[in-house]
Amino acid sequence: MQRIILFISIMSIIFSESGHNHNHSHENEFGIAIGVVPGHDDEGDNIGLHLHYVKGIGEHNDFGIGISIETIFDEHKHNSVSILGTYHFENGFTIAYAPGMLFEEHDGETEREFTQHFELYYEFELEHFHVGPQIDIGFDDNETHYMLGLHFGVDF
């Protein structure tokens, strides 16, 4: 039932905004996403937090590059720092790829390993702010996780 509601919500967003022209002329963005990370590391659901800064590049700032920090509030103190590349589509969707370093605590020691994240979010624009749904998928050596949440950005 939850998947059906999620699917209907996503399709509703896609078709309700298909005629809306999005403006990505801003040169900088500070964004935050908060969401649920289901079943991470065989635990129950956890809260995830994602912060990023992106500098727009190109004629209309459709592309961007920046830095990203992610944390999952779980028993293992899952934290990552990544370089972030983004592309803004004219229909309001943004995709991002973020390779970086994961820091995770196990048995009192901090382990480091390569991580990568793929993100997809939709922007409802409100002057210099935007808000919308986001999905974030993370791949590490030992596991894959995803976060379903809400993205909020400030454009300047």
Predicted region positions:
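Cleavable N-terminal export/targeting peptides
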Residues: M1-H26, F156
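Short glycine/proline- and aromatic-enriched beta-strand/turn motifs that initiate or cap beta-hairpins
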Residues: E17-T71
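Residues that define the transmembrane beta-barrel architecture of outer-membrane proteins
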Residues: H26-N28, E43-L49, K77-V81, F103, ...
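Repeated loop/turn-to-beta-strand initiation elements of outer-membrane beta-barrel proteins
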Residues: N28, E59-I65, G92-I95, E123-G132
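Transmembrane beta-barrel strands of outer-membrane/channel proteins
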Residues: I32-P38, I65-T71, I83-G85, Y97-M101, ...
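Gram-negative outer-membrane beta-barrel proteins
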Residues: P38-D42, E59, T71-K77, N91, ...
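Residue-level signature of outer-membrane beta-barrel architecture
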Residues: K55, G85-Y87, Y122-F124, I137, ...
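Outer-membrane beta-barrel "beta-signal"
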Residues: F118-F124, T144-F156
